[in-house]
């Protein structure tokens, strides 16, 4: 390392360094290029024949060429393929295409209602091929149908398929008509006079709170239903008691669970 350092220091102080480098480049440019073979001959290296394993490879290539030419007769020639250099046409299929029936199995099962000592169980199998989002939508639909049973009788609903899905309609219930024969010079009792609970639609009913910090709940049928027709359409009946009609309205407005927790219904 010390000698190399000294050489570097000397070259830095050598005043004719650039001139020497230029002369070396000029000599190198004028030197004639020679192949490795010529360099070996200059050094007295004799040229030898190819090794035996190279000759064996050459002999095998020569012998295999006629074989390839003979086998080419077994391949069907494609006129377009002849225009591509180095392309060899492969053997063509000598059988005709056959139609194969493909049957896709399905694991879907129709709804099954089971009964045991714990009660009834309904099993629904979801359709195949649903994405995660589609399966979530399917579950939400089933849940909505089940929850709607609180507000109407599903067994009496009509079922209609549409382009967008399914339409379920409630069967309209015709209210009973009570004939009242008036009696002259008599004053009927309140129970006899009230033949339809809707006649009490403006009468409020009060429910006491379960906690002293809450105010009593006072509500009427008019606040829960816009009309008698709406009351009837969600399962109301003129023969209901006033309290039953109020509770039906709370369920219809989805207030029943909140009221049940806070008030004595």
UniProtKB/Swiss-Prot annotation:
The N-terminus is disordered and is involved in binding N(0). The region of interaction with the L polymerase is necessary for transcription. The hinge region is highly variable. The central domain is involved in oligomerization. The C-terminus is basic and essential for binding the N-RNA template. Residues 35-77 are annotated as: Disordered. Residues 109-170 are annotated as: Oligomerization. The modification Phosphoserine is found at residues 60, 64, 226-227, 233. Nonenzymatic cofactor regulating the function and conformation of the RNA polymerase and part of the transcription and replication complex. Binds the viral ribonucleocapsid and positions the L polymerase on the template. Acts as a chaperone for newly synthesized free N protein, so-called N(0). Plays a role in virion assembly by acting as a bridge between N and L. The lineage of its organism: Viruses, Riboviria, Orthornavirae, Negarnaviricota, Haploviricotina. InterPro entries: P-protein-C_vesiculovirus, Phosphoprotein_C_viral, Phosphoprotein_central. Residues 171-193 are annotated as: Hinge. The modification Phosphotyrosine is found at residue 14. Residues 1-60 are annotated as: Interaction with N(0). Changing residue 64 to A: No effect on viral mRNAs levels and infectivity. Residues 49-105 are annotated as: Interaction with the L polymerase. It comes from Vesicular stomatitis Indiana virus (strain San Juan) (VSIV). GO terms for biological process: phosphorylation; viral genome replication; viral transcription. Residues 58-70 have a biased composition (Acidic residues). Residues 245-265 are annotated as: Interaction with the Nucleoprotein-RNA and template-binding. This is Phosphoprotein. The keyword Phosphoprotein applies. The keyword Iron does not apply. Phosphorylated in the N-terminus by host CK2. Phosphorylation of the phosphoprotein is required for the transcriptional function of the P-L complex. Keywords: Chaperone, Host cytoplasm, Phosphoprotein, Viral RNA replication, Viral transcription, Virion. Homodimer. Interacts with the L polymerase; the association of P and L forms the polymerase complex and positions P optimally for encapsidation of newly synthesized genomes with the nucleoprotein. Interacts (via N-terminus) with N(0). Interacts (via C-terminus) with N in ribonucleocapsid (via C-terminus); this interaction allows to package the L polymerase in the virion and positions the polymerase on the template, since P acts as a bridge between N and L. GO terms for cellular component: host cell cytoplasm; virion component.
